[in-house]
């Protein structure tokens, strides 16, 4: 299985929940957690944060070293922090923050690349992957 397979799973999950944002966490080529819709009225639970919390619970750990986060959109600062603090090894995302803003979603214009460059524990980033599909 490859990046395309897992990104398609994130896209499918977003669409299944009637949402634009989806996230999948993979370890050892297996899906550990996925999320696509946040609870109504709770802005803390973006697809990425939900998937991270589910993965930590499933693996019974606070660290996700060796895991890859696939997200249909570039993680916002909150979601990037969650990935960073749990030691996710890699983030693969499709649409960019600028794409999200262009389509009317409220965003703080601080990119994952900017945050990553200033972190002490860098995450491997693969940006704009399957951007058009996302």
Residue ranges and their predicted role:
Residues 1-17, 75, 81-134:
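Zinc-dependent deaminase
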Residues 40-54:
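A short, polar/charged loop-to-alpha-helix boundary motif
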Residues 53-86:
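Helix-adjacent hinge/juxtasegments
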Residues 24, 68-70, 90-92:
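A structural signal for isolated positions on well-ordered beta-strands in alpha/beta enzyme cores
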Residues 36-37:
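Residue-level structural signal for beta-strand termini and adjacent loop
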Residues 21, 65-68, 123:
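Residue-level recognition of the N-termini of beta-strands and the immediately preceding loop/turn
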Residues 21-29, 33:
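Short beta-strand scaffold segments in enzyme catalytic cores
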Residues 4, 45, 49, 77:
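Glycine-rich phosphate-binding loop at the start of an alpha helix
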